[in-house]
C-alpha cells in the first residue's frame, strides 16, 4: 500500500500545469498514460501514420504520429504546426508538435475524473448555438446545437456529456470536504484570441483550438504551463468585493438537483447527454459522421456494460476486417474513454434479440468472446453487429481510498482488496496511513461517490459490504464508471438535516397559525420536522425549516406546481449564508434579473452573471420575485443590489426593499440598474444608459463596483375609490383602497392611455415584443390613433397641492415627475429658469406637476421642440377623479375608478448607485484581463 502526496491544494500529473477544474491528485497517476497499440478510429482530416513513443509525462494520452492534410494548430502552444507530421491523442484528439510533447500536462479525458479535487456536478442549460466555442471532451468546434454549463464555462457536444467529468465550480459548502481556503478553478480553452498570459504576458488564447487556461473565479488567464507559477490561492480578482465567497454559503445535499439548488428553470433534454438515448448511435471520438466503411473495414456497435445496453447507448468503431482481438478491444476502449488495462477486459457478443430489448441480463452473452484463436469481428466471416465490453473476474485489486477531509498531506492511499476485504476492514487499514490511528475506527465509515457529469451521488457502504464484489458490480453496469467512482473514508458525523424552503404565492395578510394550517392542508406537512421560521404576511410568503431531506424534497415537488385559493405557489430551495465568515471589506452584490424585460436579453444576462459571480446571489424575478433574494441576504451586514429590467422592474424591487427594510441587517442597500426595458428613464438619469445593448457583463459589474451613491425620493400613492366625485357612482361597487409606490412619474390621462394600449397589445402577443425598436414603433402607432382624441381632462379631475386648490389649464394629460426624464429620455419640465419654482432634483422632496395638451404636444416634447406646461411643485397632492380615467405609475398602467388619489413622500429616501463618469484611458494602458475574458451573452454576435 502507498500514500500519494498532495503538493499544496492541487497536484498535476508530472507537475507543472493544472487540470481544468479543482484537482488534487498524485503524480503516481501519471503512469496511467499508456501507449495503446493499433490504429484508432481516425482523426478526420489527418491520416494515421507511425506511432512514435510518447513521453511518460503526458497524463493519460495515447499519442501517435499522423500525417496532416490541412492546416492544424498545436493545442499546447496554439502555434501552427509546420510540416506534415503531428502527434494526435486517439482518445481526446489533443494535437501537439513533437517539441511540445514533453511539456503536455493537460490530462486526457480518460483519466481526467481521477484528477478532480472535489467532485461537483454540472448544471446544463438548453441546447443552443455557441459560436467559436470548442467541446471540452473531443476538442472539436461546436457547430450544431450544443450544451453549456450554467455555472461554469464548460461547453460540450450532447454525445460527449457522458465522458465529461464532474469538475464544476464549488459554489457552496455541503458538509463534505468543506474548507475556507479557495483555490483557482482552472478551465481550459475558449479564451478570447487576444487573451494574454498572466505570467509571461504573451498571447495565450486562440480562436483555432482549445488552448490556454482561465480561472473561473478571478478570471486570470495563462498558458497551461505558466499557470503552475501562479499562487494556488484565488482572491476572486477585480470582483472580490462583489462575489459571495463559497465558504460563506452552506447548502446540505438533500436530493435536490443543481438546477433546483440554483433556482434555474430546468430544460427537458433527451437522455443524459443524448448519447444515443433514443436508440441512435453516438459517433466516435472524432465526431465525424460515420460513413460507409472502406473496403476491408467494418463498423461495430460497442456497448459499455449493462447500463449502455439497457439505454441503447453505443459507440461506433471502425476497424480492419483483419484486425486482431487486442486491436479491436483497444479501439473499443478508446471510443469509450476507458483507461483500464485491456488485459482485464474482453468483448462479448451481444445477441440481436438483446439489442431490441429494453433490459438485458448482462453476462448471458458471454459465450461469444473475442479471442485470438476464435472468430473475431475482424475475421472476415459473418460476425455480430454489436459487442459489449466486459470485465474479467479478479482475485484481488488495488483500490484508492481518499480522505473525506482536505487538511491532510495526501490525496489518497492505495490498499489491496481481496474477496475477504470489507468496508470495515478497509477503514481499519487506511486510518493509520492517514495519521488517524489514535481515533476510534467506529467513528469512520466508507463512502462511495459516483462522480457523474450531471449528478454526484454519495452512498454510505455497510460495514460488511465486500468491496471486490462491489467493484465487479460497478463494472458489470459500466466499465468506465469505475474510473468515475471514488471511495472516501469519512467521519461518521451526525449532520442534522436542514433545508430552508421558500414558499410564495400564498394569500397575504394571514396569521402564523393560518399559514401553518393552510400549508398542512395543501401539503400534509409533518409538524415534527417542518416549522415556519419566517413569515412575510404582506407578500403572502413563508420560509419553512425542514429537518428531513426526504420531507423537504416531497414538499418541494408538491408545492412548486400547486395552486392555493386560485394562486399558483412558488417553492424555492434557499441556502444558508454564513455572514460571520464574510471578509471585512466584502459588500456582495445581490442580482435580480427580469428575463421578460425588453429584448429578452435577461436570459443571457442570467447565465453570464451566474458564471461571473456565485450563482447563489443571482435571482430570476419570474421565479418568486425579489423576496427570496432579500430574505437570503437579510443577515448580511453590507450588500448592494443590481436590478436588470425596465422601470417597472426597478419599482418592483424598490417596493420589496421598502417592505422588508426592517428585517435587513443592511437596512439601506444601494441599488444599481441595468436597463432592459423600453423607456428606462431612471437608468438614463443615473447614467446607466438608454438600454442594454450587449455590453460586456464583466464591465457592467466593474461599473457597479465603482458607482457613486446618491439619494432618491420615493412617493406613496393612495388610491381610494370609495368617495366618488359623482353622485351617480355606487360606493358599494367601488374598488377597495390600495397603495402603490412611485419612483419616476405618475401619469393621468392621455399618456397613461397610450401606455395602457401598448400594455394590452403586448399581453395579447408577447412574442412580438422582443425588440426595443419594435416596442417604440407600437407606441408611435398607438399615438397616431389617438391624435384627434379629446377628453378635456381638466374638466374631469380636481387638483390640490399642499391642500390648496390649483386651477388646471386645458390639458389632456397630467403628469407628476420625480426625475428629469420622461417618455424615454424627454425633459418634460424643461430647462428654462422660472422664479416660481425651485430647480428640480431627484432628492429634493418635491414633485413637479406638468400638463400636456395631447399626442402632438407629447411628440414635440420627446423631439426636444417643446416642454410641458408647468403647473405646480410640492410634496403633498390630492387628485379627485370625477370619471374612470387611465393612470400609470412608472410604466404600469390601469384604469382607475372615480375617487381620490393622494400622493405623499414615502418615508426615507432610497439609496441608488449612479454610474461614475468614464475617465479617459491613457495611451499604452491595457484592459483588465478579466474584461477580455468575461463571457459575453450567448446571443451576442461577438
Swiss-Prot record:
Phosphoserine, modified sites: 22, 26
Position of sequence motif LXXLL motif 2: 574-578
Recorded catalytic activity of this chain's protein: a 1,2-diacyl-sn-glycerol + ATP = a 1,2-diacyl-sn-glycero-3-phosphate + ADP + H(+); a 1-O-alkyl-sn-glycerol + ATP = a 1-O-alkyl-sn-glycero-3-phosphate + ADP + H(+); 1-O-alkyl-2-acyl-sn-glycerol + ATP = 1-O-alkyl-2-acyl-sn-glycero-3-phosphate + ADP + H(+); 1,2-di-(9Z-octadecenoyl)-sn-glycerol + ATP = 1,2-di-(9Z-octadecenoyl)-sn-glycero-3-phosphate + ADP + H(+)
Ranges for domain DAGKc: 584-721
Post-translational modification summary for this protein: Phosphorylated by PRKCE and PRKCH in vitro.
Pathway: Lipid metabolism; glycerolipid metabolism
Compositional bias segments (type: Basic residues): 911-924
Known outcome of mutating residue 160 to G: Abolishes translocation to the plasma membrane
Alphabetical list of InterPro entries matching this protein: ATP-NAD_kinase_N, C1-like_sf, DGK, DGKtheta_RBD, Diacylglycerol_kin_accessory, Diacylglycerol_kinase_cat_dom, NAD/diacylglycerol_kinase_sf, PE/DAG-bd
Region of interest (Disordered), residue spans: 1-59, 269-295, 908-942
Keyword match Lipid metabolism: yes
Top-level division of the source organism's lineage: Eukaryota
Feature: compositional bias, Low complexity: 45-59, 932-942
Record SUPFAM superfamilies: Cysteine-rich domain, NAD kinase/diacylglycerol kinase-like, Ubiquitin-like
Zinc finger motifs (Phorbol-ester/DAG-type), residue ranges: 60-108, 121-168, 183-234
Broadest EC class assigned to this enzyme: transferase
Regulation: Activated by phosphatidylserine.
Every Ras-associating domain range: 395-494
Keyword Kinase part of the UniProt annotation: yes
GO MF entries: alkylglycerol kinase activity; ATP binding; ATP-dependent diacylglycerol kinase activity; diacylglycerol-dependent serine/threonine kinase activity; DNA-binding transcription factor binding; kinase binding; phospholipase binding; receptor tyrosine kinase binding
Effect of residue 246 to L: Loss of diacylglycerol kinase activity
Family that this chain belongs to: Belongs to the eukaryotic diacylglycerol kinase family.
Comment field on protein domains: The L-X-X-L-L repeats are both required for binding and phosphatidic acid-mediated activation of the nuclear receptor NR5A1.
Primary role: Diacylglycerol kinase that converts diacylglycerol/DAG into phosphatidic acid/phosphatidate/PA and regulates the respective levels of these two bioactive lipids. Thereby, acts as a central switch between the signaling pathways activated by these second messengers with different cellular targets and opposite effects in numerous biological processes. Within the adrenocorticotropic hormone signaling pathway, produces phosphatidic acid which in turn activates NR5A1 and subsequent steroidogenic gene transcription.
Identification of the protein by name: Diacylglycerol kinase theta
Organism: Homo sapiens
Annotated gene: DGKQ
Amino acid at each position: 500500500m502507498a500514500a500519494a502526496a498532495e503538493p499544496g491544494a492541487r497536484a498535476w500529473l508530472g507537475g507543472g500545469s493544472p487540470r481544468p477544474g479543482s484537482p488534487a491528485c498524485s503524480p503516481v497517476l501519471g503512469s496511467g498514460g499508456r501507449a495503446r497499440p493499433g490504429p484508432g478510429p481516425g482523426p478526420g482530416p489527418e491520416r494515421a501514420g507511425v506511432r512514435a513513443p510518447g513521453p511518460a509525462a503526458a497524463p493519460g494520452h495515447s499519442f501517435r504520429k499522423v500525417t496532416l492534410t490541412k492546416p492544424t494548430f498545436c493545442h499546447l502552444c496554439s502555434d501552427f504546426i509546420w510540416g506534415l507530421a503531428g502527434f494526435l491523442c486517439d482518445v481526446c484528439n489533443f494535437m501537439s508538435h513533437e517539441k511540445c510533447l514533453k511539456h503536455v500536462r493537460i490530462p486526457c479525458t480518460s483519466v481526467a475524473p481521477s484528477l478532480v479535487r472535489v467532485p461537483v456536478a454540472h448544471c446544463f442549460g438548453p441546447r443552443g448555438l455557441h459560436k467559436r466555442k470548442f467541446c471540452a471532451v473531443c476538442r472539436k468546434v461546436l457547430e450544431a446545437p450544443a450544451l453549456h454549463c450554467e455555472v461554469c464555462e464548460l461547453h460540450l457536444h450532447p454525445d460527449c456529456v457522458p465522458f465529461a467529468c464532474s469538475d464544476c465550480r464549488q459554489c457552496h459548502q455541503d458538509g463534505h470536504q468543506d474548507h475556507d481556503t479557495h483555490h483557482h478553478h482552472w478551465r481550459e480553452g475558449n479564451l478570447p484570441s487576444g487573451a494574454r498570459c498572466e505570467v509571461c504576458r504573451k498571447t495565450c488564447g486562440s480562436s483555432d483550438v482549445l488552448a490556454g487556461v482561465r480561472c473561473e473565479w478571478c478570471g486570470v488567464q495563462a498558458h497551461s504551463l505558466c499557470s503552475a507559477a501562479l499562487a494556488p490561492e484565488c482572491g476572486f480578482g477585480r470582483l472580490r468585493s462583489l462575489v459571495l465567497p463559497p465558504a460563506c454559503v452552506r447548502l446540505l445535499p438533500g436530493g435536490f438537483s443543481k438546477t433546483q439548488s440554483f433556482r434555474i428553470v430546468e430544460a427537458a433534454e433527451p437522455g443524459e447527454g443524448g448519447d444515443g438515448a433514443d436508440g441512435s448511435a453516438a459517433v466516435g471520438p472524432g465526431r465525424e459522421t460515420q460513413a460507409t466503411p472502406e473496403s476491408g473495414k467494418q463498423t461495430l456497435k460497442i456497448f459499455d456494460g449493462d447500463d449502455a445496453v439497457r439505454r441503447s447507448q453505443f459507440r461506433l468503431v471502425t476497424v480492419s476486417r483483419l484486425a486482431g482481438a487486442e486491436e479491436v478491444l483497444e479501439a473499443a476502449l478508446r471510443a469509450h474513454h476507458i483507461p483500464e488495462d485491456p488485459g482485464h477486459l474482453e468483448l462479448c457478443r451481444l445477441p440481436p434479440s438483446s439489442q431490441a430489448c429494453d433490459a438485458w441480463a448482462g453476462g448471458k452473452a458471454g459465450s461469444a468472446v473475442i479471442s485470438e484463436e476464435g472468430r473475431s469481428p475482424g475475421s472476415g466471416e459473418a460476425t455480430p453487429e454489436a459487442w459489449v465490453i466486459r470485465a474479467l473476474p479478479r482475485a484481488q485489486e488495488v483500490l484508492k481510498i481518499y480522505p473525506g477531509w482536505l487538511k491532510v498531506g495526501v490525496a489518497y492511499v492505495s490498499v489491496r482488496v481481496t474477496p475477504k476485504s470489507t468496508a470495515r476492514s478497509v477503514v481499519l487499514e487506511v486510518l493509520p496511513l492517514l495519521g488517524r490511528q489514535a481515533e476510534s475506527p467506529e467513528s469512520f465509515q466508507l463512502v462511495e461517490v459516483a462522480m457523474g457529469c450531471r449528478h454526484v451521488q454519495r452512498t454510505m457502504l455497510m460495514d460488511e459490504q465486500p468491496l471486490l464484489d462491489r467493484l465487479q458490480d460497478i463494472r458489470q453496469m459500466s466499465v468506465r464508471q469505475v474510473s468515475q467512482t471514488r471511495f472516501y473514508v469519512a467521519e461518521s458525523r451526525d449532520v442534522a438535516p436542514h433545508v430552508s424552503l421558500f414558499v410564495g404565492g400564498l394569500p397575504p395578510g394571514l396569521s402564523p397559525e393560518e399559514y401553518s394550517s393552510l400549508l398542512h392542508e395543501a401539503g400534509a406537512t409533518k409538524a415534527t420536522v417542518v416549522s415556519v421560521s419566517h413569515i412575510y404576511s404582506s407578500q403572502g410568503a413563508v420560509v419553512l425549516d425542514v429537518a428531513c431531506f426526504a420531507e423537504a424534497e416531497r414538499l418541494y415537488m408538491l408545492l412548486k406546481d400547486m395552486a392555493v385559493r386560485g394562486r399558483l405557489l412558488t417553492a424555492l430551495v434557499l441556502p444558508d449564508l454564513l455572514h460571520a465568515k464574510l471578509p471585512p471589506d466584502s459588500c456582495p452584490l445581490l442580482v435580480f434579473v427580469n428575463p421578460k424585460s425588453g429584448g429578452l436579453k435577461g436570459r443571457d444576462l442570467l447565465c453570464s452573471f451566474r458564471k461571473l459571480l456565485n450563482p447563489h446571489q443571482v435571482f430570476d424575478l419570474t421565479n418568486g420575485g425579489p423576496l427570496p433574494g432579500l430574505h437570503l441576504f437579510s443577515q448580511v451586514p453590507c450588500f448592494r443590489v443590481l436590478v436588470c429590467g425596465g422601470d417597472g422592474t426597478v419599482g418592483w424591487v424598490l417596493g420589496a426593499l421598502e417592505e422588508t427594510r426592517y428585517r435587513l441587517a443592511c437596512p439601506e442597500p444601494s441599488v444599481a440598474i441595468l436597463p432592459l426595458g423600453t423607456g428606462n428613464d431612471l437608468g438614463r438619469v443615473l447614467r446607466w444608459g438608454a438600454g442594454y445593448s450587449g455590453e460586456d457583463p464583466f464591465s457592467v459589474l466593474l461599473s457597479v463596483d465603482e458607482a457613486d451613491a446618491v439619494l432618491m425620493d420615493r412617493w406613496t400613492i393612495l388610491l381610494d375609490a370609495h368617495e366618488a366625485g359623482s353622485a351617480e357612482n355606487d360606493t358599494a361597487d367601488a374598488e377597495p383602497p390600495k397603495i402603490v409606490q412611485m419612483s419616476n412619474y405618475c401619469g393621468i390621462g392621455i399618456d397613461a392611455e397610450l401606455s395602457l394600449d401598448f400594455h394590452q397589445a403586448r399581453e395579447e402577443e408577447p412574442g412580438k415584443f422582443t425588440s426595443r425598436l419594435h416596442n417604440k414603433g407600437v407606441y408611435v402607432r398607438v399615438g397616431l390613433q389617438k391624435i384627434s382624441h379629446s377628453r378635456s381632462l381638466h374638466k374631469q379631475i380636481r387638483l390640490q397641492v399642499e391642500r390648496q386648490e390649483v386651477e388646471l389649464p386645458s390639458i389632456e394629460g397630467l403628469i407628476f415627475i420625480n426625475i428629469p426624464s420622461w417618455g424615454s429620455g424627454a425633459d418634460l419640465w424643461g430647462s428654462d429658469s422660472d422664479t416660481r419654482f425651485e430647480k428640480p432634483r431627484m432628492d429634493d422632496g418635491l414633485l413637479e406637476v406638468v400638463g400636456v395638451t395631447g399626442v402632438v404636444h407629447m411628440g414635440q416634447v420627446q423631439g426636444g421642440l417643446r416642454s410641458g406646461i408647468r403647473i405646480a411643485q410640492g410634496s403633498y397632492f390630492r387628485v379627485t377623479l370625477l370619471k374612470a380615467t387611465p393612470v400609470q405609475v412608472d410604466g404600469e398602467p390601469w384604469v382607475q375608478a372615480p375617487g381620490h388619489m393622494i400622493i405623499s413622500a414615502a418615508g426615507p429616501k432610497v439609496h441608488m448607485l449612479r454610474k461614475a463618469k468614464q475617465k479617459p484611458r491613457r495611451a499604452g494602458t491595457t484592459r483588465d484581463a478579466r474584461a477580455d475574458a468575461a463571457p459575453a451573452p450567448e446571443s451576442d454576435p461577438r
